């Protein structure tokens, strides 16, 4: 773990800031009652008003009625399950697919132990966490977009289809 520097209480600048009440809360205002009684209810009521306003102005229409005799060609899950659906769809062994899905949170749990930094540092000074985030986001987007395509184009996203067609024609 990183070594944290203890504050020098003999420093006159620090003592002046602490005397003004700038130690724990930088602005010097207590959270009670200002924030909890006045600001939070306004934010909560504003959020509820925005939700009600959107529900009134843009109501969510119910789709066409279900027809049990006409099923779609491919059933897709909700958009936030697309990467998981793509993993299960492309991996031939279902147990391996489930193990891949379990390995994602297990791998993310190991990231804090790989870096020995202070938790308040800049993300650019934490290269492992930044790299894991960027690669994970790219892979999740790749899998999510691929889940909406047919199975033969899902891994390449249809980007290499022209080259494959040209090789078949030769």
Curated annotation (Swiss-Prot):
Reported function: Component of the cytochrome b6-f complex, which mediates electron transfer between photosystem II (PSII) and photosystem I (PSI), cyclic electron flow around PSI, and state transitions.
Superkingdom as given in the UniProt entry: Eukaryota
Organism, as annotated: Nymphaea alba
Gene3D superfamilies tied to this protein: plastocyanin oxidoreductase, Single helix bin
Keyword Transport among UniProt keywords: yes
Name of encoding gene: petD
Cross-referenced Pfam families: Cytochrom_B_C
UniProt similarity note: Belongs to the cytochrome b family. PetD subfamily.
GO MF annotation terms: electron transporter, transferring electrons within cytochrome b6/f complex of photosystem II activity; electron transporter, transferring electrons within the cyclic electron transport pathway of photosynthesis activity; oxidoreductase activity
InterPro entries: Cyt_b/b6_C, Cyt_b/b6_C_sf, Cyt_b6/f_cplx_suIV, Cytochrome_b_C_euk/bac
Bilayer topology: Multi-pass membrane protein
Protein name: Cytochrome b6-f complex subunit 4
Entry GO terms, CC: chloroplast thylakoid membrane
Keywords for this protein: Chloroplast, Electron transport, Membrane, Photosynthesis, Plastid, Thylakoid, Transmembrane, Transmembrane helix, Transport
GO BP: any one term: photosynthetic electron transport chain
Residue spans crossing the bilayer: 36-56, 95-115, 131-151
Quaternary structure note: The 4 large subunits of the cytochrome b6-f complex are cytochrome b6, subunit IV (17 kDa polypeptide, petD), cytochrome f and the Rieske protein, while the 4 small subunits are petG, petL, petM and petN. The complex functions as a dimer.
Subcellular location: Plastid, Chloroplast thylakoid membrane
